[in-house]
Amino acid sequence: MRAEWIAKRRGQSNVSQMHYARQGVITEEMHYVANRENLPVDLIRDEVARGRMIIPANINHVNLEPMCIGIASQCKVNANIGASPNSSDINEELEKLRLAVKYGADTVMDLSTGGGDLDTIRTAIINDSPVPIGTVPIYQALESVHGRIENLTPDDFLHIIEKHAQQGVDYMTIHAGILMEYLPLVRNRLTGIVSRGGGIIAKWMLHHHKQNPLYTHFDDIIEIFKKYDVSFSLGDSLRPGCLHDASDEAQLSELKTLGQLTRRAWEHDVQVMVEGPGHVPMDQIEFNVKKQMEECSEAPFYVLGPLVTDIAPGYDHITSAIGAAMAGWYGTAMLCYVTPKEHLGLPNAEDVRNGLIAYKIAAHAADVARHRQGARDRDDQLSNARYNFDWNRQFELSLDPDRAKEYHDETLPADIYKTAEFCSMCGPKFCPMQTKVDADALTELEKFLAKDKETVSQS
């Protein structure tokens, strides 16, 4: 779809959407996004120029259907997939991708660390994906030195980052905010450093006693991103891994650095979003969102959860969707889903489905609470179908139509029950929605009540 759009940009030194927006240019991607979001295209351009919205759209991802991430648009959901050395392969990951897109993932991150040739897996995912693809290049950098963290060099990082950009990755998590001087701040944490990328960088700094190479070479990464229009997803390496560690000095120190890096990328017209926690008690979620907006000049916030309790392994798609809904309400732009397997193992296709639906619920609830234009229309349409016992329409409007129909048909599978004015919960005699009060009856009742009130007042 984008081949013709991109052809005229090739060879330019900066092809980012922010670069064009700041020149007053409205790109084809901006027009496409405006139509999807039902927003004025001038607003899209202005938000991208300001940095409050990104359109992750690598010029080498030609089959991408452009979307946006920002506070002015609908709250988005990311789904993580990826093969590991112990489980899964390319075919399983492609099936997860298709399921994620089917159930509404706005972006997908390939977090593969093994299970086959990483370049082959990534390229297949990009070529098969209509949604933006994100990656964490440090994983492949570590694999390239066979897990020997101390052998990694800045050039290793830059080589892998450019390779991902050339392959068409739309945004990358770059763990540039964790600095050497912040490492002692994790001493009093219960769970230390829980970011995989952050842990790799921390071990590198502890071994070499040198500053984070992603920080010292940040300008080199900017130059790569400009050439391909890759968006930064600035990784929160020191995000809290439990409630005890939430909003501590380590987390907030890194956040301040992420804000500085955001503005440095903006100086070169490179798009940025900022990643956030993690595990956060409900009473601290608003603070975390507002603090990010303050430190990072309102760059889009992209949070993992956050989980609001640590005691429910196997159900962390629920514990985190609670926090995600609140974070979205307070202004978070994109929610990274959590599956039931979080903290327990690699998610399978069914886990992807369950995690994604939980997060589509959270994002939609946030949009309704923020009074986004048209956000509640689908709710009202489904409620109308429910009141009128239009079962097939209810299924159609559901976030997961297959699951809704499956549960209905467990007890009433015959087609005749698709027009029945009851379900198996109440049966044919006790469903309250059968109580249809017509307008004439209400008019008569109002007359009676008015007359009764008049009689009482006269007495």
From Swiss-Prot:
It catalyses: 5-amino-1-(5-phospho-beta-D-ribosyl)imidazole + S-adenosyl-L-methionine = 4-amino-2-methyl-5-(phosphooxymethyl)pyrimidine + CO + 5'-deoxyadenosine + formate + L-methionine + 3 H(+). Zn(2+) binds at H279, H343. InterPro entries: ThiC, ThiC/Bza_core_dom, ThiC/BzaA/B. Binds 1 [4Fe-4S] cluster per subunit. The cluster is coordinated with 3 cysteines and an exchangeable S-adenosyl-L-methionine. Pfam families: ThiC_Rad_SAM. Its cofactor is [4Fe-4S] cluster. The keyword Phosphoprotein does not apply. [4Fe-4S] cluster binds at C423, C426, C431. The keyword Cell division does not apply. Pathway: Cofactor biosynthesis; thiamine diphosphate biosynthesis. GO terms for cellular component: cytosol. Substrate binds at N80, M109, Y139, H175, S195, R196, G197, D236, S237, L238, R239, E275, Y302. One of its GO terms (biological process) is thiamine biosynthetic process. Its EC number is 4.1.99.17. Belongs to the ThiC family. This is Phosphomethylpyrimidine synthase.
